[in-house]
Amino acid sequence: MNLEETMPLVFERSIPGRIGFSLPESDVPETNAGDYFDQAYIRSVPADLPELSELEIMRHYTNLSNHNFGVDSGFYPLGSCTMKYNPKINEKVARFPGFANIHPNQPESSVQGALELLYDLQTSLVEITGMDEVTLQPAAGAHGEWTGLMLIRAFHEKNGDTKRTKVIIPDSAHGTNPASAAVAGFDVVTVKSNEKGLVDVADLKKVVGEDTAALMLTNPNTLGLFEKDIVEMAEIVHEAGGKLYYDGANLNAIMAKVRPGDMGFDVVHLNLHKTFTGPHGGGGPGSGPIGVKKELIPFLPTPVLTKKDEGYTFDYNYPDSIGRVKPYYGNFGINVRAYTYIRTMGPDGLKLVTEYAVLNANYMMRKLQEAYDLPFDQVCKHEFVLSGNRQKKLGVRTVDIAKRLLDHNFHPPTVYFPLIVGEAIMIEPTETESKETLDSFIDTMLKIAKEAEENPEIVQEAPHSTYVKRLDETRAARKPILRYQKEV
């Protein structure tokens, strides 16, 4: 079944002259756009916009929405993405008129309630991470990574230590880590993992040196394993004059149990749209605050939100600041949702989040290891990585398993990542799923493993029940069609 056959594009539905909404006649004099804009910016022909009735538009987009899959639709075990349920109380609070109807250009005196919320959120994140200060400016995780690395760069440059041009990153790291380091102007050095899936400390000692600016780590790492040698690694990097950067993508595994700051990390970024239930998966907006230790505070993006006797205010007096990294003060709506979540859960609730996330992951891992290879057989944290190598020998690849899950109304896990595991299947159940849901997914995965043995074609040709089958993902990435062009 082809989506283009079952549901034409809105442009293809257009009927010339069909009007969805009629505007009243203008009661002010008409003006000529040419009096205000250069001719180069004025259309010579009207925009080719679709013409449909309101009913047709409503049906079109309602039907499209039925093709979507999200956390509210079903189980979404996308590894390293923390696709947990987003409580709807978050949406209610974010829609309070006092939050939804304000503007960042208003005088500070008129938005003290909003500033208080942001300040309290910063304070909460300081406590959760063990940092000394937090900025809410970065818009998402990778943006937070880049911002944190720019702070580290500014710190070294301020100290005249310009030879520190290298950032060390594990071979199991998120792809955004080396990308962020490169964009921040650093050279990337890879440190190997050992046979247990952890950073090889001996190899780290070899690559650390006078040119080391920072070591970027995710803890637990992308295999879902806790880096037990983190204190020793922090000492190695600090003795060499470098900084330790924490990728907060996996904070859901340790939140309210241990703090990155207590492990020796100097900079932390968080994903409020993941760990703290700001909705994600649709392209944004997100929120990627960073926390820093005391010696990096002078380099924070301005303005810095502070509390004084007369109220909350933005402080621009940071001469060593790296400057703004986003217009205004971060994605306010996502920050409201994260604050609501933290206040709703409280310290004890956040601890339970971690405990249930880890419990669910270990339960699933043990149930699935009978049918799939488990490269690192040890207690995991919030997620775990299987390998489809056993199925590959039968002619069924990990991508086939992922596509077959669609027929059972499950979103596939992350596949082929981390790169150090062949035919990787990365599963993160999160804390919000019930045992019944986990068991249903486990049964389906075991069934697919059985199909790979007895009827591999049904897996190789999956999905069978979706609106579209297999897309040419390589072509879509290399030759994207990003806008509609009318056939002449």
From Swiss-Prot:
Cofactor(s) the protein needs: pyridoxal 5'-phosphate
Pfam families referenced in this protein's UniProt entry, alphabetically: GcvP2_C, GDC-P
An annotated GO BP: glycine decarboxylation via glycine cleavage system
Molecular function in Gene Ontology: glycine binding; glycine dehydrogenase (decarboxylating) activity; pyridoxal phosphate binding
Reactions accelerated catalytically: N(6)-[(R)-lipoyl]-L-lysyl-[glycine-cleavage complex H protein] + glycine + H(+) = N(6)-[(R)-S(8)-aminomethyldihydrolipoyl]-L-lysyl-[glycine-cleavage complex H protein] + CO2
Residue numbers carrying N6-(pyridoxal phosphate)lysine: K274
Keywords annotated in UniProt: Oxidoreductase, Pyridoxal phosphate
Its EC number(s): 1.4.4.2
GO annotation, cellular component aspect: cytosol; glycine cleavage complex
First-level EC class: oxidoreductase
Subunit structure: The glycine cleavage system is composed of four proteins: P, T, L and H. In this organism, the P 'protein' is a heterodimer of two subunits.
Function field: The glycine cleavage system catalyzes the degradation of glycine. The P protein binds the alpha-amino group of glycine through its pyridoxal phosphate cofactor; CO(2) is released and the remaining methylamine moiety is then transferred to the lipoamide cofactor of the H protein.
Family statement drawn from the similarity comment of this UniProt entry: Belongs to the GcvP family. C-terminal subunit subfamily.
PANTHER family per the UniProt record, alphabetical: GLYCINE DEHYDROGENASE (DECARBOXYLATING), MITOCHONDRIAL, GLYCINE DEHYDROGENASE, DECARBOXYLATING
NCBIfam families hit by this protein: PRK04366.1
Protein name: Probable glycine dehydrogenase (decarboxylating) subunit 2
Organism: Listeria monocytogenes serotype 4a (strain HCC23)
